[in-house]
Amino acid sequence: MKRWIVAILVVAGCGGSGVSGDKACTDLATAVCNKRSSCSNGANVVKIFGSMANCLTRTKLTCTDALAAPGNASTPAHEEICATAWGGATCDEFLLGNEPADCVVAGTLADGAACEYGGQCASSYCTNEKEAQCGSCGMPPLMGGDCTRSSCARGQICFTDTVTNTMTCIVDGASGASCGRIAPCNPGLACIGATATVNGACMAAAVSAGAACDNKIGPGCARDLGLFCNTMSATCTTVQYAADGAACGVTASGDFVDCQQGTCYGSVGTTVMGVCKTDAADGAACDTVNGPSCTTPARCVPASGTTAGTCYLPGTVSC
């Protein structure tokens, strides 16, 4: 299962002509959050941020922090160009983390230098940044590599297997591709005919609530649009979003309950049936395995040798 976080690489920097940093970051946040909402019928906004207002605030926060990051080669004017590019991006590009070329810049920091954002680095990637105050400039994990602590390359997603609690960089399957528990499909497609031991095939998904569905023979339902195939009614139903402490997973009536601005956790790690834990606030306690996670863009930085830590907001220290 994917936690469905789309990582937006912020490459803002100081300087530029005409537009202010505040205006550029407001416009970028608006473009990104509008795309997040329109590509998911609002479901991705609720899942990651809880509300559009919080999406705008937290996305802008990422941008304004990056303005002060050393080594960043971009300008507020460039962020305006990036905002326009995100407005014209396809939903597949957005949901698969395929950042527009107009949003990518190479910074001045060499490999190995401390960083928080890819735009600081000559490689345009900041690695090992997920569970630390500072990462280091370098290259992202290879396809199939572990992404527990590093973001994947553009065009790849970090897939979480809730059975093994591992995180791997993958590319979702196109129409007709083999699919299964650890091989999901592109947005707009559903995995049909898969079992616990046998893969199925990616097929076009139904895109509206109330449409007929069948996970064995097709069509399935578009999960990226917040839909779930209720096997009891054989129709696509809208995913429900629950608050902290509520049960998550498939209900007795066959509907699916996910977590609003949070993640579903079992006794150990993430799961598809468990209890919701809302993402923790900046500075609050977190746990990289048992939750809660932190409110984006904060990172859970664990104490040495443990999984328990504190939600750290980038910009608290200079990297």
What are the roles of these predicted feature ranges?
Residues 15-17:
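Bacterial signal peptide processing site
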Residues 21-26, 75, 79:
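Solvent-exposed, acidic/flexible segments
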Residues 100, 105-118, 134, 138-149, ...:
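Secreted/surface-exposed cysteine- and glycine-rich disulfide frameworks
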Residues 45-105:
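Compact alpha-helical subdomains of small soluble proteins
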Residues 22-57, 61-62:
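Short N-proximal segments of mature Sec-exported proteins
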Residues 1-12:
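Sec-dependent bacterial lipoprotein signal peptides
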Residues 96-97, 116-133, 150-165, 182-198, ...:
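Extracellular, cysteine-rich, disulfide-stabilized repeat modules with beta-strand cores
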